[in-house]
Amino acid sequence: MGKKKVAIIGSGNIGTDLMIKVMRLSEVLEMGVMVGIDPASDGLARAARMGVATTHKGIDGLLAMPEFADVEIVFDATSAGAHKRNSELVLAAGKRMIDLTPAAIGPYVIPPVNGDKCLDALNVNMVTCGGQATIPIVAAVNRVAKVHYGEIIASIASKSAGPGTRANIDEFTETTSQAIMDVGGATRGKAIIILNPAEPPLIMRDTVYCLCEDADQEAIRQSIHDMVAEVQSYVPGYRLKQAVQFEHIGSNRPLQIPEMDGEYTGLKVSVFLEVEGAAHYLPSYAGNLDIMTSAAMKTAEKIAARMHEGATT
């Protein structure tokens, strides 16, 4: 199978990290164009040094480039607000779109959970970095015991959050909360993001709480460990910070949760994660970049394989 050419819209932290991954790691994707809006951005400068065609004129500049004709897949690493127009123009040109913003125009994709179910969609959404780290865990619990409520807290180093991430905090929480339900399988979902200003910057850490039906704890633990191994297959720095914790919530002391109707009794599962980045662009503390761009590249590679299958049948 020949390599599929890709373009990346957004020359910030996420876009630049993704570009480096495609060039260093992918056997089926090839960089075609890096697109930005700031001619002085480090991402565009780095792309040019690495021999990638660039434009600082945004989506309009991309459409005007002769290299765009050979591009088959476009990644959008801009912002939720910019994605709608970007998607419309890219799809109108007959290309596939992978959305790394919280815009969520297309279906949510979490590779180890539903990565094979959306390969024919013209636009797929990668949820958020926090979603990519935590929703696999919610799904792992849910496949053993029905999750009534899933809550995740994603803590990332402030230095790893560029202007696009900062502008999309509300969209981050809304999109992640919805994906906890739609992909993770929880009846209700809640997401919280923390930008940690600590110096030196701390590694990405995520906490997952699931309130679920009472079930075999060992089966839940094993399901979580199996899921962690699946994520590690494309994000080696993804790991459990400590042992999975369980707590029985009895009828004598039921939980009152604003997001849920009535009282809750059952099993509380607590999972603590950390994500160490591969340091392709920002240092290893930026695991939030690594899990997002790794998931996007894995999804693009699966889409490329599906496109190849379609072309040969």
Curated annotation (Swiss-Prot):
Gene3D superfamilies named among the record's database cross-references: Dihydrodipicolinate Reductase, domain 2, NAD(P)-binding Rossmann-like Domain
The protein's enzyme class: oxidoreductase
UniProt cross-references to InterPro entries, sorted A to Z: Acetaldehyde_dehydrogenase, Acetylaldehyde_DH_C, NAD(P)-bd_dom_sf, Semialdehyde_DH_NAD-bd
Catalytic activity annotation: acetaldehyde + NAD(+) + CoA = acetyl-CoA + NADH + H(+)
Coiled-coil intervals: none
UniProt-listed Pfam families: AcetDehyd-dimer, Semialdhyde_dh
One MF annotation (Gene Ontology) recorded for this entry: NAD binding
Keyword annotations from UniProtKB, A to Z: Aromatic hydrocarbons catabolism, NAD, Oxidoreductase, Plasmid
Protein residues bound to NAD(+): 11-14, 160-168, 288
Biological process annotations from GO: catabolic process
Active-site residue numbers: 129 (acyl-thioester intermediate)
Taxonomic superkingdom: Bacteria
Keyword Secreted assigned: no
EC number: 1.2.1.10
NCBIfam families: ac_ald_DH_ac, PRK08300.1
Family statement: Belongs to the acetaldehyde dehydrogenase family.
Protein name in UniProt: Acetaldehyde dehydrogenase 3
